[in-house]
Amino acid sequence: MRTNVGEDFARALASKDSARMRELFADQIDFQALTPGRHWQASTPEKAVDDIILGVWFGPQDDIHELRSVTCGQVRDRERVTYRLGVKRNNTEYVVEQHAYYESDGTHITWIRILCSGYRPESME
């Protein structure tokens, strides 16, 4: 079964595969994202992956233990991927969902906008 670049990105993120994520981004990428309380920008794969995605959002202390869902689609000429992750941080279970709209050359993501739900507690007790 062939996956698209967006699904490949979601799977690489879920496994925290930094090399694969950098490989999926074009050398010059227009990366912007919105998380609760902050706007992020990067123009290189290293900045986007190492400094932002795996440097802050899902750092070494965060265990992404499950890719709960991934869906892909298109909005005219723009691709879309939505993924939901199960993450353990500081001994607490969370759900994190992100929606990404992106453009690619078929192999590399050249433009991406990500919107993140933030870390939502698994249990609302």
Label each region the model flagged.
Residues 1, 38-46, 95-100:
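Charged, low-complexity, helix/coiled-coil-prone segments
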Residues 1-28:
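Short acidic-aromatic low-complexity motifs
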Residues 3-13, 38-39, 54-58, 111:
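Short, mixed-charge, low-aromatic patches
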Residues 6, 13, 25, 49-53, ...:
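Hydrophobic alpha-helical core bundles mediating ligand binding, dimerization, or RNAP-core interactions
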Residues 9, 21-22, 29, 48-49, ...:
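Hydrophobic pocket/interface hotspot
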Residues 12, 32, 87-88:
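Alpha-helix C-capping/helix-to-loop hinge sites
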Residues 20, 26-76:
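A solvent-exposed, acidic/Ser-Thr-rich amphipathic alpha-helical stretch
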Residues 53-125:
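A beta-strand edge to alpha-helix "cap/lid" segment located at domain peripheries
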